[in-house]
């Protein structure tokens, strides 16, 4: 459920384009106008504004925003402009080929998207960057972490609600054996189950594992795996159980302690604002006894703060 508020009566794309053009004129730009328009338009409306702006002014709106805005606000607005699949592809490209590989962002995008979304992302990635997503993962990831990502990308998973209890129990026993023996060959068993099974099935396996062995499957994974391999398996498991809690926890981590992980904060707020942010907000308040709105307000400043808070909606 989306949180950003769209006006009851939305101006036409031409009116919005005119207002943006005026906001860019003169020394500097009127950032408030840019935020008031773009933070309160959905993806379809933003695309129409872009088309109208280019048609009327023979200018690329995103390039204009890139030249006029600065800092974290610029990053947030530019990430907000594309439709979801294009945005995800660009996040993956930057995460894979940036100065530092952002393994957590890669796992977040790949392991929280549906099979149909992943197929679209792969197509857009290839069309936009002239290289397959799998090829960049081959180049930048390694070991079991790479194997999980590639398997998750290329496996067709059932996405319905039905489960087979016998298969669930068998997977619980197989996972117990895989994490108990610590044989290298058992890693492939973990990869196969975590990347091949539906989210509903994995939730049932997690519950059955707890009932059969008196231990959380997540703890077993943490005890017996390490590094990026551990992180991507836990991401798959946590998102199968409750993806909104996964995002709430990631937001909390981005703002906890000294400093702010603005890259993660921007990525999650922007990518979830039109999807399930209302449920993430509810999870955040329930788990941390503080509203996400107040947390973001405390960790950001100026127009950057205004833009993110506009995407979050009212303080609830």
Swiss-Prot record:
Domain notes: A pair of annexin repeats may form one binding site for calcium and phospholipid.
Annexin repeats: 11-82, 83-154, 166-238, 242-313
Pfam families named among the record's database cross-references: Annexin
Lineage: Eukaryota, Viridiplantae, Streptophyta, Embryophyta, Tracheophyta
Phosphothreonine, modified sites: 112
Induction remarks: Up-regulated by cold, heat shock, dehydration and salt stresses.
Residues the entry annotates as binding Ca(2+) 1: 24, 26, 28, 68
Family, as annotated: Belongs to the annexin (TC 1.A.31.1) family.
Translocase is among the record's keywords: no
InterPro entries the UniProt entry points to: Annexin (IPR001464), Annexin_repeat (IPR018502), Annexin_repeat_CS (IPR018252), Annexin_sf (IPR037104)
Protein name: Annexin D5
């Amino acid at each position: 459920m989306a949180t950003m508020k769209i006006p009851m009566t939305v101006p036409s794309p031409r009116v919005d384009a005119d207002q943006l053009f005026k906001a860019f004129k003169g020394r500097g730009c009127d950032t408030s106008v840019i935020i008031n328009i773009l933070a309160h338009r959905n993806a379809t409306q933003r695309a129409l504004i872009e088309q109208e702006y280019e048609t009327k002014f023979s200018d690329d709106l995103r390039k204009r925003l890139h030249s006029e805005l600065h800092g974290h606000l610029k990053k947030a607005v530019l990430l907000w402009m594309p439709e979801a699949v294009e945005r995800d592809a660009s996040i993956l490209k930057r995460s894979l080929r940036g100065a530092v590989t952002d393994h957590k962002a890669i796992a977040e995008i790949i392991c929280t998207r549906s099979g149909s979304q992943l197929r679209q992302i792969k197509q857009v990635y290839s069309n936009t960057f002239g290289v397959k997503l799998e090829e960049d993962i081959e180049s930048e990831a390694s070991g079991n972490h790479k194997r999980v990502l590639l398997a998750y990308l290329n496996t067709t998973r059932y996405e319905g609600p039905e489960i087979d209890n016998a298969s669930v129990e068998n997977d619980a026993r197989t996972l117990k054996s895989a994490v108990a023996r610590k044989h290298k060959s058992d890693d492939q068993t973990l990869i196969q189950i975590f990347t091949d099974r539906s989210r509903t099935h994995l939730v049932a396996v997690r519950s059955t594992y707890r009932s059969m062995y008196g231990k959380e499957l997540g703890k077993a994974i943490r005890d017996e795996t390490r590094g990026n391999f551990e992180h991507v398996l836990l991401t798959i498991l946590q998102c199968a159980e409750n993806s909104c809690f996964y995002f709430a926890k990631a937001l909390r981590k981005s703002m906890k302690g000294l400093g702010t992980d603005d890259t993660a904060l921007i990525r999650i707020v922007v990518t979830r604002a039109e999807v399930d942010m209302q449920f993430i907000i509810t999870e955040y308040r329930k788990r941390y006894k503080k509203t996400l709105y107040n947390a973001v307000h405390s960790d950001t400043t100026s127009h950057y703060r205004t833009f993110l808070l506009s995407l979050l909606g009212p303080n609830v």
